[in-house]
Amino acid sequence: MEVTEKNRTKYRMPGEFEPHEGCVMIWPERPGSWNYGAREAQKAFVKVAEAIGVSEKVYMLVSKAQMENAKNQLGNVSGVTLLECETDDAWARDVGATMVLDEKGAVCGVDWQFNAWGGTFDGLYRNWEKDDRVAAFICRTLGCPCLDRKSTRLNSSHRL
């Protein structure tokens, strides 16, 4: 079937102020971004997760190598679920799925292609393959459809 304007599903990205189920964070560990074994960054991430976990779910993506450490620091924090997922850095907003709602209000995730903010020409770091898989992992884990970036077009309300 050919996709036309009439049969195309329309999605919208909810505002940050709208009710939502939870958020995704990535446990910091990458030496190029976090000095001293990321100890201070991890303490800060624990505080953020504690604050958020009071009012909504926190899904913390943690590498296999860091899982025991994360359990020790986050194991008693209310609302936090640890999920084993290998990543290249800790920027869930940039590498994760953009959650959108379809016309019926069902949640879907958009999997944008992540390239470390510039790719092979000017990217911040060379290996971002793990980060590029995070969005699909989040969608699978949360049980929501994952929209391919190639079939997604952004429009503002002024354009519609």
What is each of the regions a protein language model found here?
Residues 4-8, 139-151:
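Conserved alpha/beta core surface patches that mediate binding of polyanionic ligands
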Residues 13-17, 89-94, 100, 151-153:
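Structural signature of eukaryotic scaffold interfaces centered on beta-propeller domains
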Residues 150, 154-160:
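Single conserved hydrophobic/aromatic residue that forms the stacking wall/gate
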Residues 59, 80-86, 144-149:
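General small-molecule cofactor/ligand-binding pocket signal
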Residues 66, 117, 160:
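Surface-exposed, flexible loop/turn segments at secondary-structure boundaries
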Residues 72-140:
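A generic, well-ordered mixed alpha/beta core segment in the N-terminal half of proteins
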Residues 1-74:
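N-terminal leader/transition segments
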